[in-house]
Structures are given as structure tokens and as C-alpha cells.
């Protein structure tokens, strides 16, 4: 059971949320007094409480979601809060639904969405994974961070062929290596205020690192927001090649490292927005004509469940009519379906852009 000091902090946090009338987070929407009273004294076997779940959203009242899972068990123990938030964010994934088993499908059915190279600047597909037997960031000890890094770096070092590369630990990284990784847009920084408030950046930079292959088309972030972020990317629009590289990497890593998986929610991640397939397939794409007709762009994107962001990701503007467009759905569908929906949507956007000449 949570101790008195934690419950006192929780009570104060709940009051703060109640008083914040302009707060629009899903946390505020679903943390009713009834749910709060049911969960406030619960504690996972690794010692995580409701405070670990909600503290980022209490601290940052402008959060969109406002909750994180401190460990895998939190998704079950604090389900009365997580489940409605998951249903709201992952539209259509009801509390009675079960996420399907992993299925990359026929990876050869994916194509180059822009063979002429006129529209798509680059293509990227990523997924997140958590290692079984370890909690998520807020509950990890420094020695666990180091132990995980050792397991992951030895696994990655055994990769062969196109995936063969180098692991760079953030601890003791030289200025030259740091600059090189920044120039390649590979280096991740210490977490933003949302992650900081969730206690996701403790013992930084212990256990954190970056692996990339020699061609710079395959990248793994170790212990950033999730235990593993596995990323495949390249210039141009060859989604097929990018997806095939990702799936072969995930399959290789999975042989050596067991991942946290939940019967109902799929692959588990620190943030509930990434659950399920955890897959985000995106392109940087130039659509000057559609950019001038934002309504049409949003209409087509909506039809294919695509998310349209600015050039540099969330909360940024489109520079020179270049957008970051990705699949929005992660839950209740397979990896194959998520990427296929994105491919169909991008092909449709390019077709419309061409017709607008």
C-alpha cells in the first residue's frame, strides 16, 4: 500500500487538477474522484504508485495526455484510469477490445511511394520495445540502466549484414562523436519537461546510448523514453525497403531479448500513446499545392487516419510546404495494417497533388 506521504502528495495533486479549469488533458478528464479514491493507495510489486502515473500531468497542466506507466504492472493495477484514456486516445479501441498478435504481413507488398523522387524527401519507420523483467524509466535503478545497456549493446553488436554497426554510449562520449551524431540528427537530448516531471531522466546519461549501422539507415536509441526505440530510415520514398529493414532488425533483436507484451494492449511502452504495434511510419513530403489547401490535406489525411505535423515534428510549422505525415493508429490493428494504411494515404496524397497542377 502507498505510504502516507505519497497519499498526501496525491491529494494535493488531485486538488490542483480539480482547480485547473482550463486544463484539457485526458488525465483531468478521466481521473474522477471515484477513480482517484479507488487507486490512491495502490502500489505495484516494484513499488510504483498512482503518483508515478500522474505526476507529469499534474506538474504540466498543458499536457495532452498527462499519464505514463512506471512499470508494466501499472497498466493492469491502474486500469480504471489507463483504460478509458487508452480508449479515448486510440479512437475505436474499446475497453473490451484485444490488440491482435504481431503480424508484419507480406513485407514485399510495400512499394516505393514516390519512384520519381518528386515529393518524398525521406521515409522512416520506428517501433518501441520494453525489455521483460525491467520496470520503465521512473523505477529503474542506476545499476539496472547499466545492466540493460550491456545486454542491448552486446545484442546489437552481433547484428550482421546491412544492420552491422557501432554502439555509442552517452556516458563519456567525446565532443567529436557527440557533434557527429548531432549533425546526423541521431543524438537524443535529455528528456523534455514532460519526461523530466515523470522522473524519466534519472541517473542521466547512465545506460543511455545510440547504435547505428554503417549506412546510417538503421538506428536504435537505448533508454531514451522507452527501453528501445528501433528506427529504420533513408532518403527517398522506398517504404518497402525501410519496412523490410525494420522487421528483420526487430526479429533479430527479439531472438536475444524478450520484450514486454500484454494480452490486451500489445507491446508495452512508457507512454500509453505508443502501445499496441508501437509503429510510427512517416515521410517528410513536399506537397506545395495541398499545403495551400490545408482543408483538403486534412480531409484526405483523416480518411486514411494519417497525422499531419510540421517539418520538425509535433508543434512545429511546415517549412517550405514540407510536412511530416505518419499513421495515427497504433492499436487494434496489425503492424502490416498500420503501415499499409499509411502507404495508401501517401499514394493518394501524391495522386491528388499531381492532379492539382
Swiss-Prot record:
Chain residues that bind ATP: 122-126, 185, 229, 280-284, 309-314
Temperature remarks: Optimum temperature is 30 degrees Celsius.
Family annotation (PROSITE patterns): PHOSPHAGEN_KINASE, PHOSPHAGEN_KINASE_C, PHOSPHAGEN_KINASE_N
Effect on the protein of changing residue 62 to G: Significantly reduced catalytic activity in the forward reaction. Altered three-dimensional conformation and impaired structural stability of the protein
Keyword Transferase assigned: yes
Example GO biological process: female gonad development
GO cellular component: extracellular space
Annotated consequence of substituting residue 62 to E: Retains almost 90% of the catalytic activity of the wild-type in the forward reaction. Altered three-dimensional conformation and impaired structural stability of the protein
The protein, known as: Arginine kinase Met e 2
Species for this entry: Metapenaeus ensis (Greasyback shrimp)
Taxonomic classification: Eukaryota, Metazoa, Ecdysozoa, Arthropoda, Crustacea
Amino acid at each position: 500500500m502507498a505510504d502516507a506521504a505519497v497519499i498526501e502528495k496525491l491529494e494535493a495533486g488531485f486538488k490542483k487538477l480539480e482547480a485547473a479549469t482550463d486544463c484539457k488533458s485526458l488525465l483531468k478528464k478521466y481521473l474522477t474522484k471515484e477513480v482517484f479514491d479507488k487507486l490512491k493507495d495502490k502500489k505495484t510489486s516494484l513499488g510504483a504508485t498512482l503518483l508515478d502515473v500522474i505526476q507529469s500531468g499534474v506538474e504540466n497542466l498543458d499536457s495532452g495526455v498527462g499519464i505514463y506507466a512506471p512499470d508494466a504492472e501499472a497498466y493492469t493495477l491502474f486500469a480504471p484510469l489507463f483504460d478509458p484514456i487508452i480508449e479515448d486516445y486510440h479512437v475505436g479501441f474499446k475497453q473490451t477490445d484485444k490488440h491482435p498478435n504481431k503480424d508484419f504481413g507480406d513485407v514485399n507488398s510495400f512499394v516505393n511511394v514516390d519512384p520519381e523522387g518528386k515529393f518524398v524527401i525521406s521515409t522512416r519507420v520506428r517501433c518501441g520495445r520494453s525489455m521483460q523483467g525491467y520496470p520503465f524509466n521512473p523505477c529503474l535503478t542506476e545499476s539496472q540502466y547499466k545492466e540493460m545497456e550491456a545486454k542491448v549493446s552486446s545484442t546489437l553488436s552481433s547484428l550482421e549484414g546491412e544492420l552491422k554497426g557501432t554502439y555509442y554510449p552517452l556516458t563519456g562520449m567525446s565532443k567529436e562523436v557527440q557533434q557527429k551524431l548531432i549533425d546526423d540528427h541521431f543524438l537524443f537530448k535529455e528528456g523534455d519537461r514532460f519526461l523530466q516531471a515523470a522522473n524519466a531522466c534519472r541517473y542521466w546519461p547512465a545506460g543511455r546510448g545510440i547504435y547505428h549501422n554503417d549506412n546510417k539507415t538503421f538506428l536504435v536509441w537505448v533508454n531514451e523514453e522507452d527501453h528501445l526505440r528501433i528506427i529504420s530510415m533513408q532518403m527517398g520514398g522506398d517504404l518497402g525497403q525501410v519496412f523490410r529493414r525494420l522487421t528483420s532488425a526487430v526479429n533479430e533483436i527479439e531472438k536475444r531479448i524478450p520484450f514486454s507484451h500484454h494480452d490486451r494492449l500489445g507491446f508495452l511502452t512508457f507512454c500509453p500513446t505508443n502501445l499496441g504495434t508501437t509503429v510510427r511510419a512517416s515521410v517528410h513530403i513536399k506537397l506545395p499545392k495541398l499545403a495551400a489547401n490545408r482543408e483538403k490535406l486534412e480531409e484526405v489525411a483523416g480518411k486514411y487516419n494519417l497525422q499531419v505535423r510540421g517539418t520538425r515534428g509535433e508543434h512545429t510549422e511546415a517549412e517550405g510546404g514540407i510536412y511530416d505525415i505518419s499513421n495515427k493508429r497504433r492499436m487494434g490493428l496489425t503492424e502490416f495494417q498500420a503501415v499499409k494504411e499509411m502507404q495508401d494515404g501517401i499514394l493518394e496524397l501524391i495522386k491528388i497533388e499531381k492532379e492539382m497542377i
